[in-house]
Amino acid sequence: MKKTRLLKIVLFLLLLLIPVVYLVRLSIFPGFFADRPDAMYGHEAYRSEFSATDGTLLRGWFFNRGQGSPLVAVYTGNNMNVGGMLALALADMSRSYLMLNYRGYGDSEGVPSESRLVADARHCIAEARRRIGGQPSSLHIVGYSIGSGVANQVAAAESPATLTLICPFDSITEVACDFVPLLPRLLLPNTFVSTDFAPRITCPVTVLRAAADTLVTAPHTAALLRAYPTPPAEYVLQADHNSVFFLPEFIPLVLKSLEKGSFSGDLPTAAAGK
């Protein structure tokens, strides 16, 4: 009788764990849109291939604006080919843009994991610097959603001139708790704990938050903002998690953040302050 009861408890816990594992897996593993081939996004002249330290080929786009140009490294969200953010590089001819798909995303080889994504990002920044020819005048890092987790870890190690985060979170595990309360903290290791890395970041940080974001809700962004040694500039966009890119003010705001790390002067009216 006791064995039967214990078995039922174990099975119940396993059933509860399934949606938690599913949510965390969804946060980093590619889906339909990430599986889209790079050719769908065009701009063949800028298509590029970088080799990771283990030989895995990472593919995407490298907009090399020439020796001494600032370098912007862009990290996208889950279920997203980085080609979806090419408009940013096309709107800015003054900076070099490194926009590579994560392992297993787009045309990139391999299987993603948190440690591999961060290691790949740092290695490819070093290679991009070499290809530019001489040190870039500055390094700027942009991260969206899961890419904000990558961006925070890279920024803590690389000391960029600016860090721009779009729909960022405190940790994936904490976000998962919104969907399955408590269990992620009890049953899974924490992943992409951005609040652990934020205290090491000394460059200006700009955060663009979506007002109608139901995936990364405001408390998770607020918890991250509190972890930085200097309060970031925070702006709220009238969009949801997946539609921030389509706002006419999105690209101007990101480009503005690269100039100074925080905003001054007039802002698009749709972007409210803190």
Predicted regions and their residues:
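An N-terminal hydrophobic leader/cap segment in hydrolases
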Residues: R5-F50
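Membrane-embedded segments
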Residues: T53, L57-A128, G149
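Gly/Ala-rich beta-loop-alpha elbow adjacent to hydrolase catalytic centers
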Residues: G143-G147, A151
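Active-site nucleophile loop of the alpha/beta-hydrolase fold
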Residues: T164-E174, A239
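Short alpha-helix in the alpha/beta-hydrolase fold that links the catalytic acid
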Residues: S194, C203, T217-R226
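Acidic catalytic loop of the alpha/beta-hydrolase fold
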Residues: A211-V216, H241-S243
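Catalytic histidine-centered segment of alpha/beta-hydrolase-like enzymes
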Residues: A239-F250
